[in-house]
């Protein structure tokens, strides 16, 4: 598969009056077109920092990033880089309705066509938010707000999705169903996605490959390709397979030396 994104020797440190705190150290990996990559690692190891660098929100102190073969280090996202970034918090505007929130990216991109309006309305129906499209965010539960934020991310048709623990606000059952649905949509539309998560089960169930980071300053500790003999649309069926148990055991053993507690659902 063709590489959509390539990181080469990326390093980054935070600076303040007391000195610097190294966050990332010589990170290198590639993400292929249509691949779903999950990144796990100890809390505070720099996973979100890495995602911010990919999104162009932070500039690495060392190394380069390439998108479709073009160097994008320090560049702001443009039309050639169709990146959708979903943060841990929903960041919905309380004075706008849910529909007005999910079309915000289309408005900013001057691409609010009738076709895109119809696409957004279909997403609202698919995620059971159509009946709430005229409601304000304060009238929705945390899980519903997070689904609205995800629709806002998908509305601009990004080629690369950056997902920073997007399901963390959902209850366990909803999280299982929504995460499986999103992964199915991403694969069906051949989107490329990078998921940051603390949940090893989620990483194994959703991803084509899991990248494990060490404690700060983070380095790539290992990579694990993920394959199952069953369809992934049913998360509980996947978690009952022998492959899942082996992947989980191996990841847990790799992370044991990092002395970090991970969530398992």
Language model region names:
Residues 155-159:
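A short, proline-enriched helix->beta-strand linker immediately N-terminal to the Walker B motif
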Residues 63-74:
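Conserved ABC transporter NBD signature motif
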Residues 72-89, 108, 235-241:
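ABC ATPase NBD coupling module
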Residues 55:
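Helix-to-loop junction immediately C-terminal to a conserved catalytic motif
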Residues 40-42:
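The feature captures the beta-strand-to-loop junction immediately N-terminal to the Walker
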């Amino acid at each position: 598969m063709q590489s959509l994104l390539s990181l080469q020797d990326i390093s980054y440190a935070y600076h303040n009056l007391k000195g610097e705190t190294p966050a990332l150290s010589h990170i290198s990996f590639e993400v292929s077109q249509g691949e779903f990559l999950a990144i796990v690692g100890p809390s505070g190891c720099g996973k979100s920092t890495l995602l911010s660098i990919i999104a162009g929100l932070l500039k690495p102190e060392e190394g380069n990033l390439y998108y479709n073969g073009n160097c994008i280090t320090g560049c702001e996202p443009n039309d050639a880089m169709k990146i959708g970034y979903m943060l841990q918090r929903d960041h919905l505007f309380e004075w706008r309705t849910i529909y007005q929130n999910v079309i915000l990216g289309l408005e900013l991109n001057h691409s609010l066509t009738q076709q895109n309006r119809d696409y957004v309305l279909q997403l609202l129906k698919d995620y059971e938010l159509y009946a709430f499209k005229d409601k304000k965010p304060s009238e929705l539960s945390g899980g519903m707000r997070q689904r609205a934020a995800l629709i806002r991310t998908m509305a601009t048709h990004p080629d690369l999705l950056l997902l920073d623990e997007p399901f963390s606000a959902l209850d366990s059952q909803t999280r299982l169903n929504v995460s499986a649905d999103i992964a199915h949509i991403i694969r069906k539309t051949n989107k490329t996605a990078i998921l940051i998560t603390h949940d090893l089960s989620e990483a194994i169930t959703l991803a084509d490959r899991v990248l494990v980071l060490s404690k700060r300053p983070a380095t790539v500790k290992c990579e694990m390709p993920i394959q199952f003999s069953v369809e992934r649309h049913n998360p509980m069926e996947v978690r009952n397979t022998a492959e899942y148990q082996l992947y989980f055991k191996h990841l847990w053993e790799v992370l044991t030396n990092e002395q970090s507690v991970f969530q398992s659902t």
